[in-house]
Amino acid sequence: MDYKKLFHKEEAFQRETFQKRMEEFGFKNMARMELFLWDLELFLHIQKILGDKIILKGGAATQFYLPRDAQRTSVDIDMLFFGTEEEIKETLRKIEEYLGTEDELFYFHKHSPKNPKTNLPLHTYYMKVPSVLSNAERNMDRESIPYQELKIEFILQPEKWEYERRTGENIFAVNSSWNYQILPLNYLFADKLTTLGCNTIGVQNERLDEQVKQFYDIMMLSRNCISEMQCSVVKEKYLKRAEQEWNTRKITLGSTLERRDYEPKYIVEDVEKQLLRYQQADSGEDAELKKFINDFHSLYLNRKVQYDPKRLPAEHHWFA
């Protein structure tokens, strides 16, 4: 591995550095920290080629707005892209040519789901990246080449989006002066809100692990960034995204949405039911949800953070 080809310094990828930062910031899972650093590294390579056509969103972007003691790890790269699939392929080809090795590291593999949940113009890839961790730490059987796998998603957009440039100087996984193009806070929060409503537009119950992550991001953005948000902008962006997602699900899922035209009140009712479930997470009657919450704590969070999903309905009134 030629670390001189990377944006982040070689020291950032060393095991000793991960251990030091884990101890400093209270994280428990070194594998997730390593993956998050590779997320940021790969995004910079993509950004260098695609310029202002690419924007980081999702969990990775969220961490740039949160203080270190509220940040979590993220294992995926979710991006908005104003361009074509051919441009994506050419970008990935250039990265493979620049970083690719003989042991299959830094090569992209297209993923095509058998039963997609939406018809979004989404292009998903997986890539193996080098790892300094043991097989046990990566939860893998013996491998001749230590690696981890990144998930990279491009969501094609019909027009360019606004974005903010933020450095990684306050990110738990690395001290980086590089600028990352990320979704503006109001847009990001509105996008996060559309993950609520498991039977309408949100993350479905089949993905409870993803639901718990989204609840966390919404709670922490509300707790730490609410004074920086413009409620009118959040509402405008949310309603636009919600309708898009409604119409997408209506086509692909064949659910009860088929018999209803888009109406925000249906989503609100759905969200209220979902919030009630999380409010009762410690009742002892929902072992499945409680397990996913506990798993999220151990895999993604630092020891210092206080995260109790059942407090979400009581703490926030933004959905009322």
Regions found by a protein language model. Name each.
Residues 1-54, 66-72, 77, 81-320:
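Structured mid-to-C-terminal alpha-helical surface segments
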Residues 56-61:
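Glycine-rich beta-strand-to-loop/alpha-helix junction loops that act as flexible
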